[in-house]
Structures are given as C-alpha cells and as structure tokens.
Amino acid sequence: TSRFHQTDKMHFKKMLAPNGERILAHVSNFRKVKRVEDVIRVFERVHEQMPSKLLMIGDGPERQNAEELCRSLSMNNDIRFLGKQDQMDEILSIADLFLLPSQYESFGLSALEAMASGVPVISTNAGGLPEINIHGKTGFLSPIGDVSDMAGHALKILQDDDTLQQFKDAAITHARTFEKSRIIPLYEQLYDTVLAEYREKKSLEV
C-alpha cells in the first residue's frame, strides 16, 4: 500500500518471518461461525510441508480456545495472535495467503480486502465467498470443514514463487472489479442486517 513504504514493509516481514517463511493470515471476530480452529488445522498441515508463520488478527469469544489449541500443538512460536489492528492493509501487505474457513459469510469483505492487498484466498464455498474468491484464479474454494482440501490448495499456491505471484496478481485484478459503487451497497446491507439482528435481540429481551 502507498502508506506503507517498501523498506518498512520488508523490515516488518523480516521481523515476523526472519528466515523467509511463508506468511499466512486470518482476520475475523473469532466467533464460532468463523471456524478458527480450522484455520489452525490448515496451517498445521501447511507448516509440516514448508517453513511458515500464521498471523491471527482480531479478537472474540473463540480466541482463548484457539490459543489453547496452539499450545497443545506446540505451535506458539509459529502462530502469532495480534488482536485487533487498525492498519489492516499494512499487515495484509506482507502476507502470502489468507485463510477464511467460515461456516457462513454474507459477502466475504475480509477476503476482498485481502485480495486488494494482493493476497490470494483459501476459503470455504459458503455464502457470498464464491463471488469474491474465484476458484483456481484468486485462490481456492473448499467444502466447509475440509481442512485437508484447504491445506492442499494452500500448498499448491505457496509451492513456488511464480505460482504465488500469479495468484497475487489475479487477486489484485479481481479486487479492482469491485468498485466503490458495488461495495458501498454491500456495507449498507451488512449494517442493515446487523441493526435488524440487534433490534430483534432487544425486542426479545423486553
């Protein structure tokens, strides 16, 4: 990104992956629907095959369980929980792959944001994700819960620099097709949905 100078970017990347490891990332509100444990299970399989690091960005009710799973797998040194972050584009700009194994996604905006930063996406085929993530081009789609399939696709993208670059370029190109005129209504829909759910919850509490 223009705000994040190349020298800063390389320094940041070197700090997180000192030996040139591939960097995978996940961003969410750490709720059950995000299937955060699947993120870790996918990464575990990737990590067995190649040097890699995982950045877990965000916070929520499933974070503690995710951290406990990391400890049980002895992967604390390779998985970093960064909490909520304001400069998302800066963090995404150093990632090589974005993992989104959600049970459901209305629009897949986090996947779109990753692609806009040039990060290919490994996701499920849930909800609106197939419209955002083009299978075999900007990343890959897998059935919900199929961590083996997701890991296989991840390794396919990460196996060599040329393949990774092809997916990165395609991700940026596809993200650009989502102009503001298309994105703003999606955000408005999302806010309307959240607001409606909140009002419904409040009415049930009364």
What are the language-model segments listed below?
Residues H5-P18, E200:
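A short helix/loop element that forms part of the nucleotide-sugar donor recognition site in Leloir-type
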Residues P18-K34, I40-F43:
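Conserved donor-binding/catalytic core segment of Leloir-type glycosyltransferases
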Residues E67-G83:
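Nucleotide-activated donor-binding/catalytic signature segment of Leloir-type glycosyltransferases, i.e.
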Residues K84, Q103:
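Aromatic "clamp/platform" in nucleotide-sugar-dependent glycosyltransferases that forms part
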Residues P120-S123, N133:
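Short hydrophobic beta-strand element within catalytic cores of glycosyltransferases
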Residues H135-G136, F140-V147, K156-D161:
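Conserved acidic donor-binding segment of nucleotide-sugar-dependent glycosyltransferases
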Residues D149, K156, T163-T177, L186-Q189:
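A short, well-ordered alpha-helix in the C-terminal region of glycosyltransferases
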Residues K180-V206:
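C-terminal alpha-helical cap of glycosyltransferases
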